Amino acid sequence: MNRIRQALAEGRPTFGAWSILPGPLPAELLGGAGFDWVILDAQHGGVVVGDLVPMLQAVQLGGTPAVVRVPWTDPPTIMRVLDFGAAGVLVPMVNTAAEAAAAASATRYPPDGIRSYGQTRSTYRSTAEANADVVLLVMIETAEALDNLDAIAATPGVDGLFVGPVDLGLSLGLPLDFTGAAPPEVDATDRVVAAAERAGKFAGTITAGPEHAAELVRRGVRFLTLGADVGYLRAGIARDKATADSLK
């Protein structure tokens, strides 16, 4: 069974990180760090489709499953990243149940969906096994998506709802904020968690680090990103530079 699906089925929160920098070396570092999963970001990161096979191999070298955030609800792209060996797909800007259904259909082979069979890196012995194992998260990032929460959550084939706090805040008319701490954003996240639980699904989101993650776990979030390769690199540089400056 997909390790992500197994952990979530057991009711445990899971923690991962974003792989934003293109190339297998940073992906390998994250894959070997002991996270429950790694998300390769092909929407806002520097990762393009041509980078994915070696990056997926690098993450999986550490025994870690990889999820790919695709650029949009584009069935051919969704199918392709799964052919490349992704354990799951994160689809941005899903606003309606129809869009969620289109994404779900692209992740499953007939009779459950429209996924075309490709053997690029497939390790599955049957299409039924692949359909049961894949994990699909759809991102809730707009006021429209909040209005359609229950319908999106109830969509067959959708496994989780993932809050995109920055875009969601902007859609709600809030100033740019990376913490998700504004009261309307907190309320929106709690609404997503409740909708996911009503549908027997799980909720996920981006965190500002371990302390923020602990708060979100208490509020019912079970799929949480702790950071990104770029952020870890930036923090390490700043720390060492500050230490060096103190010696001058």
PLM regions: where:
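Conserved anion-binding
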Residues: 76, 86-176
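Alpha-helix-loop-beta-strand connector modules within alpha/beta enzyme cores
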Residues: 49-83, 107-112, 130-131, 181-203, ...
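Active-site beta->alpha loop and helix N-cap motifs at the rims of alpha/beta catalytic domains
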Residues: 26, 31, 35, 60-102, ...
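C-terminal alpha-helical cap/extension of soluble enzyme domains
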Residues: 74, 115-124, 134, 140-144, ...
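Glycine-rich, proline-tolerant flexible connector loops at the mouths of alpha/beta enzymes
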Residues: 26-54, 163-181
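Short, acidic/polar
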Residues: 19-33, 72-80, 143-155, 208-214
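N-terminal amphipathic alpha-helix/helix-capping segment at the start of soluble metabolic enzymes
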Residues: 1-20, 126-132, 190-198
